[in-house]
Amino acid sequence: MRAEKHHKGWNEIKTNDSWAIFKIMGEFVNGFEKMSKIGPCVSVFGSARTKEDDPYYKLAVNVSKKIAEAGYGVITGGGPGIMEAGNRGANLAGGTSVGLNIDLPFEQHDNPYIDSDKSLDFDYFFVRKVMFVKYSQGFVVMPGGFGTLDELFEAITLIQTHKIGKFPIILVGSDFWTGLMDWIKGTMLKAGNISPEDLNLIKIVDTEDEVVEIIDAFYKGHTLSPNF
């Protein structure tokens, strides 16, 4: 793909970029139109590669079921693995189940547990990320890879820089996440690259009950609304 782009002239690239603006606008308009109607939701993130017999898949189902039973919808990336588990849990509880799918050359396909009227497809990661951040009342982050970390640190950065209001960010699975948090404390914090209070943005838990307790406790003192 990149080799092909090298052979294009700058004028051709400029023209293509100009037309891409309309596609980007269309994704934003369609996303805002649909997402504005879903009500309070919590986003569940994690690896697309997690298998159904994995303990974290089962935990993600239970976490999402509990979230839906507490009155929140569940938003995922719409694909397999932990994303499927998230939609599955919401579906089992009869709750709102939203999927924000991304067009990829591998891995990604819509899972069958998304509400038929709440499945959105995106070509652009950055448009999709806006939908997660704008319409989520909390981020629940299960074990995952680079994409999961991307979503996690995007939210932390936006809250830290006061571009959006604070909302719960919950890492599920202490065995998986403790090493990362130890590195953040022992390296980033020690070097003065973050402040001690920045660490308060993140909670690590191991059960579905803890997830819902944190979210409910937070919204006893905050209003449920889109983040910007």
Language-model region placement:
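Glycine-rich beta-alpha loop segments
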Residues: 7-100
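Solvent-exposed alpha-helices and their adjacent loops that cap or buttress functional pockets
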Residues: 35-37, 68, 91, 111-114, ...
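Active-site/ligand-binding-proximal alpha/beta "capping" segment
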Residues: 123-175, 219-225
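C-terminal functional extensions of proteins
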Residues: 171-228
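Acidic/glycine-enriched connector segments
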Residues: 81-141
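Structural/interface elements that position substrates and couple domains in central-metabolism enzymes
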Residues: 2-6, 21, 218
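Short gly/pro/ser/thr-enriched loop/turn and capping motifs at secondary-structure boundaries
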Residues: 104-108, 148, 176-179
